[in-house]
């Protein structure tokens, strides 16, 4: 088993921000023969994890409410392990101060470590710092990976001094990312599980939250967290990232053109994501400039389940009129697509 801890260079005796790992081999028959390896340090992108010198009173609540615990210097519940066919993955997070000044704003530093096989060294595959919309506090997080490699993350959110809306009380929220998204970023928009309706009455808050997967489909994320909602309660919410459909394609971005000097033969490139369970190939995609004739072409290669691919249309667009603002729309035209709302 692997034991991990985060260490901040603001702490005495710590020179650089890092994650420290120990391998523990327990001999259940002869406990005295158990072994703990020397520590392995993985240097991280610098972070600030100290709030108020390490005290338990950190994040002021709206309307002069008591400042509650940011749960600093702790890897939050829990580091999650998952085996895939060609690598192992571990996810974890802890709170950081993303403001960089005397004004505090809690954010979530999260990591995915990978090893190529059991017993091989762990390496940082991706690390990101999540900040909530409107510069709200985000902390007390828990994250896990579903059967498709998508990440779901639940967390606590509340107004900070940097927020335009100062009245958001402690609530429970979620975000996430698809497995094929650009690394280091939680790409999904924030979702609301429950908004708080009152301040937490003391400094102690949460201790930890907990996310887990529904064993029924290995896709639904269940997240439980502490909020004030008609009293102090632990409330569970459920959300899902992976599709339940066999056939489901989506155009997730129009990559070019974007802006600048455009030409009479402008290339149009889009990114397609296969959200379904089945691999797909030989489907049509289209683009349209304003109300002009729709361009339809065939994507002949295969996009495996959960993967993304770029396609550049062979038919170019005339976008050369100076001062003109062009509107470009694009769609996937898969026969039998079971969710046409995201095409």
Q: What name fits each language-model region?
A:
Residues 244-343:
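Extracellular/luminal regions of secreted and cell-surface proteins that mediate adhesion/ECM remodeling
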């Amino acid at each position: 088993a692997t034991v991990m801890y985060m260490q901040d260079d603001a702490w005495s005796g710590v020179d650089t921000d890092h994650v420290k790992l120990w391998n523990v081999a327990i001999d259940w028959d002869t406990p005295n023969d158990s072994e703990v390896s020397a520590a392995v340090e993985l240097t991280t992108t610098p972070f600030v994890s100290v709030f108020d010198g390490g005290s338990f009173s950190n994040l002021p609540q709206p309307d002069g409410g008591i400042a509650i615990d940011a749960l600093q210097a702790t890897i939050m519940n829990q580091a999650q392990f998952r085996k895939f066919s060609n690598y192992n993955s571990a996810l974890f997070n802890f709170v950081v101060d993303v403001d960089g000044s005397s004004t505090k704003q809690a954010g979530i530093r999260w990591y995915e470590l990978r090893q190529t096989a059991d017993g091989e060294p762990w390496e940082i595959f991706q690390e990101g710092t999540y900040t909530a919309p409107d510069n709200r506090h985000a902390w007390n997080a828990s994250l896990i990976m579903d059967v498709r490699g998508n990440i779901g993350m639940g967390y606590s959110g509340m107004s900070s001094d940097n927020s335009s809306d100062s009245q958001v009380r402690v609530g429970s929220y979620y975000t996430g990312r698809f497995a094929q998204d650009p690394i280091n970023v939680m790409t999904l928009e924030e979702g609301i599980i429950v908004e708080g309706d009152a301040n937490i009455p003391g400094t102690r808050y949460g201790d930890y939250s907990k996310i887990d997967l529904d064993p029924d489909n290995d896709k639904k994320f269940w997240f439980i967290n502490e909020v004030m909602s008609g009293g102090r309660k632990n409330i569970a919410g459920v959300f899902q990232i992976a599709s339940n459909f066999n056939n489901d394609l989506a155009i997730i971005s129009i990559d070019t053109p974007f802006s600048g000097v455009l030409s009479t033969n402008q290339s149009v490139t889009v990114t397609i994501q296969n959200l379904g369970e089945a691999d797909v190939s030989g489907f049509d995609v289209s683009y349209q400039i304003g109300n002009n004739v729709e361009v339809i072409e065939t994507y002949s290669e295969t996009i495996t389940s959960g993967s993304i691919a770029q396609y550049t249309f062979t038919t170019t667009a005339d976008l050369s009129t100076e001062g003109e603002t062009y509107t470009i729309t694009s769609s996937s035209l898969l026969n039998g697509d079971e969710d046409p709302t995201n095409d």
